[in-house]
Amino acid sequence: MGKQMAALCGFLLVALLWLTPDVAHAQTQILFQGFNWDSWKKQGGWYNMLKDQVGDIASAGVTHVWLPPPTHSVSPQGYMPGRLYDLNASKYGTKAELKSLIAAFHAKGIKCVADIVVNHRCADDKDGRGVYCIFKGGGPRGCLDWGPSMICCDDTQYSDGTGHRDTGADFAAAPDIDHLNPLVQRELSDWLRWLRRDVGFDGWRLDFAKGYSAAVARTYVQNARPSFVVAEIWNSLSYDGDGKPAANQDGQRQELVNWVKQVGGPATAFDFTTKGILQSAVQGELWRMRDKDGKAPGMIGWYPEKAVTFVDNHDTGSTQRMWPFPSDKVILGYAYILTHPGVPCIFYDHVFDWNLKQEINALAATRKRNGINAGSKLRVLAAESDMYVAMVDERVITKIGPRIDVGNIIPSDFHIVAHGNDYCVWEKSGLRVPEPEGRR
């Protein structure tokens, strides 16, 4: 009876850890996107080049690095995958080079996040109809060697009509995979476990996660047990008749909250709501940074522990510039996300190409020194057109905006630790230290 009780307790402990992951661990993360849209063009291989920058990335207090899609792909960037086990066909480098890069990050205590593209797949061959729908896995024992029956039946351009209907948004450029098919679930789960056990990845970034249901994502997360998951659920803001974002974006952030709750475990989502509001707010509309309840207006206002904040990525910024942050205001975005709740994500370009490394590192150091984490307490002290001021954990105060005179908002026992054009960060200290010149 004692052994049975011990076994039961052990099972319950594992279940509890799955349902309520280590909050402290989740809250101390800084994610770094380690590539841009054109990284595949790097002579000598991106993996090899990035390996030389591991030390610089670690110096910013980064805990997780997001790496590009590692597999064979019809498109050089990796987002039109085909042979999923073939890591030597990647434009970023070979499998051996990838494993060496991951080992270098692990040696610095940084976990590696794979860009997982499984909503759709590109086939190697045509079937008898002349349709590209014969897939090759490039791996052991015919794994991931599929035919048209593994495609969603409503993707009529490629499917033979025998699969299930798509559980998410359509992806027109390639066959949408039937994620309700048991063989698909089993073999993709095996592949995800292989990425962790054989290649060394610790977590995932789920590309185009709107393409399949949260229930499907939950299945893969439960089967493969990554330590970190962040989903790309790119939802548009609501806009008023004047073309500007509406003041209320509750519907947008609710979609993100719903997804992470339905997936559970370590699942988080990129906070597209905060990005959209913030990049409008820094253009003379900082009043947007406080919602009707006095909280942050994005996902971090409702569920910060599960929100990954960012300024730009390979899609929104880089050379694609699909939804870019104003170029002259980028550092204001970092002043916000690196001192606020949520898990901040730093973009490669801004550190290594935009000459913002020193300022970003100073903000990241402030975050680490004061223990700011995903669940930190935020108090918005002011949100007006030309000034936003907030206190985090009663230890750090951030001011964004061109207004120089902030009145009596800043207590006398706070001193400046980071500042630049239109932003300033104060830190509480028992001993008042001299303020840098140019207090803002």
Curated annotation (Swiss-Prot):
Gene3D superfamilies given in the database record: Glycosidases, Golgi alpha-mannosidase II
Tissue-level expression: Most abundant in embryo-derived callus tissue.
Cofactor note: Binds 3 Ca(2+) ions per subunit.
Entry annotation: catalytic residues: 207 (nucleophile), 232 (proton donor)
UniProt keywords, alphabetically: Calcium, Carbohydrate metabolism, Glycosidase, Hydrolase, Metal-binding, Signal
GO molecular function: alpha-amylase activity; calcium ion binding
Secretion signal, residue range per the UniProt entry: 1-26
Similarity comment: Belongs to the glycosyl hydrolase 13 family.
Protein name: Alpha-amylase isozyme 3A
Organism whose genome encodes this protein: Oryza sativa subsp. japonica (Rice)
Gene that produces this protein: AMY1.2
